Amino acid sequence: MTELSKYRNIGIFAHVDAGKTTTTERILKLTGKIHKIGEVHDGESTTDFMVQEAERGITIQSAAVSCFWNDHRFNVIDTPGHVDFTVEVYRSLKVLDGGVGVFCGSGGVEPQSETNWRYANDSEVARIIFVNKLDRMGADFLRVVKQTKDVLAANPLVMVLPIGIEDEFCGVVDLLTRKAHIWDDSGLPENFEIKDVPADMVDLVEEYREMLIEAAVEQDDDLLESYMEGVEPSMEDIKRCIRKGTRTLTFFPTYCGSAFKNKGMQLLLDAVVDYLPAPDEVDPQPLTDEEGVENGEFAIVDADLPLKALAFKIMDDRFGALTFVRIYSGRLKKGDTILNSFTGKSERVGRMVEMYADDRIEIESAQAGDIIAIVGMKNVQTGHTLCDPKHPCTLEAMVFPEPVISIAVAPKDKGGSEKMGIAIGKMIAEDPSFRVETDEDSGETILKGMGELHLDIKVDILKRTYGVELIVGEPQVAYRETITAEVEDSYTHKKQSGGSGQFGKIDYKIRPGEANTGFVFKSSVVGGNVPKEFWPAVQKGFGSMMNTGTIAGFPVLDVEFELTDGAFHAVDSSAIAFEIAAKGAFRQSIAKAKPQLLEPIMKVDVFSPDDNVGDVIGDLNRRRGMIKDQNAGVTGVRIKADVPLSEMFGYIGTLRTMTSGRGQFSMEFAHYAACPNSVSEKVVTQVKERKAAEAKK
């Protein structure tokens, strides 16, 4: 077993095409995990092992790989860069202790880089910055360093300087050692020499080295005082201070190179060892009660404590069902019985494996700090806590975003429904941001996801992996409804048909609630006109109706219901009577409260070459977009805008046409906003037409 202090659980984060997966490939090559390097553009990379990943040259799932460097164990997770798969980044951050943010030397801080960086900040994950592709045309290391300050509000700590640039890039100067690492053009990582700093770089190296040491010694008051008196700290003290500043997110050690040409990778791996934290150096995960509220206890990273582990990913592949697990406390052995605290059921651990992309090595045991996969777990889902049955506990839950887009699907073959249902069930277990439901009116199967590409990939997986050919409908937007006026009203439910009857009368107010509060129930009833025992029934009845609004049948958001008075009958009143009364109150009063249709607004981040900025902005305006910000860079302009999702279908094709293939964009859900009347009327008409067509079938 590796010592806990020598574990590094890290993720590789970047924008699409920044070289993230290639960087991972080079790490595996250098650590001896692979002998032939696979290239993303050839569809051969080790961590992009899905057919869809290989064909599209993007990472879709987070692939976990274990390897070793300088006696340290690395568990490396290569995460997706496309915004539609951000859920993979989110759940990876939940179980990582550190990360490497990869930025393109010419593209700089691109849209999805910013999103992933923000998520990592929220999770307080320590990071190293690696500026990749310095052999590319237009690459500029110091410009990208400045962008990380300006765009990400990061504090990059420059650790190396490049020697040469673009096609003349040949190596880097290590500022700490004042030594140049120069590679030949063979593309082999081991073919490098360590030399003195080139004469024309000496002054620049000394300038940046001084800034580096000043930033480092600020982490230690005694060292800072000595340094101010002219005493240079030892290499050991400098590294200790850099490690401290990295762990506290005070700064981010910044390196550069070319992963594709194997230049600069060894220094990056050394930095992971030297500066990123071990599992027991990060804040422990909080434990919660059954309601998800923190209870003041923590999952201390210690192999000698009772088992506490988090299932953070489910994957069904050619080997069977895999449950990826991060062990925070304790040990886990083959044959152990563990408790799933979410279901309350125990399960025996069969085979355990270390993952090597889509390959695996069977292991007998694992301990705190490990990221492993368990084969054949039956009742475990993403976010479930696995623990010692004698010491039950619950780790903080994983929360996933709500889908914003949906499509209706049906199997082409009449007998394919069961096959489709089984396949979709497996896919939902793997991806919590992918949902399915059945339309109550039409009986259609509705797939819901985070974007067009997300659902496109799911349909492709159903076809290729599970052999289910589908008829796919047009993408549908997840509209919502709300109210804009307060209504004071009364509703009586009375039923008498021999024997005991039903009676429940409620007086109430409904009003617009605060944004993102959903349904809020209050009671200001004084006295016993509506006994307290019936209040939950009123809440349940009204709340159950919030799934179907009165405008077009979309779910209703942000409504506050206040029960003010009412009446009951000693014999005929019951919980069911008051629940029915509350449902009637919804139908009666929502329509009076000036209901309004809401549409999802997306936060859109577009990169446009200078020549096409006017066209891009004009197109966003035509899509009802609101331009929020523009930032000019060396290679083009970043445009940020809020745009309705309904206007963004097919946008990538339009952008590529306008920019001759050079434009890029990302988008993520921002908020719901009121639809203009013209849009609302159009949506209502479409819903009516769809229901009429379904009724004729």
Swiss-Prot record:
UniProt cross-references to InterPro entries, sorted A to Z: EFG_II, EFG_III, EFG_III/V, EFG_IV, EFG_V, EFG_V-like, EFTu-like_2, G_TR_CS
Cellular component, GO annotation: cytoplasm
Keywords: Cytoplasm, Elongation factor, GTP-binding, Nucleotide-binding, Protein biosynthesis
Subcellular location: Cytoplasm
Binding site for GTP: 14-21, 78-82, 132-135
Main location (coarse class): cytoplasm
SUPFAM superfamilies to which the protein is assigned, alphabetical: EF-G C-terminal domain-like (SSF54980), P-loop containing nucleoside triphosphate hydrolases (SSF52540), Ribosomal protein S5 domain 2-like (SSF54211), Translation proteins (SSF50447)
GO terms, biological process: ribosome disassembly
Residue intervals of the tr-type G domain: 5-280
GO molecular function annotations of the record: GTP binding; GTPase activity; guanosine tetraphosphate binding; translation elongation factor activity
Entry's family note: Belongs to the TRAFAC class translation factor GTPase superfamily. Classic translation factor GTPase family. EF-G/EF-2 subfamily.
Cited function: Catalyzes the GTP-dependent ribosomal translocation step during translation elongation. During this step, the ribosome changes from the pre-translocational (PRE) to the post-translocational (POST) state as the newly formed A-site-bound peptidyl-tRNA and P-site-bound deacylated tRNA move to the P and E sites, respectively. Catalyzes the coordinated movement of the two tRNA molecules, the mRNA and conformational changes in the ribosome.
Protein name from the UniProt record: Elongation factor G 2
Source organism of this protein record: Shewanella denitrificans (strain OS217 / ATCC BAA-1090 / DSM 15013)
Upper classification of the organism: Bacteria, Pseudomonadati, Pseudomonadota, Gammaproteobacteria, Alteromonadales
Gene expressing this chain: fusA2
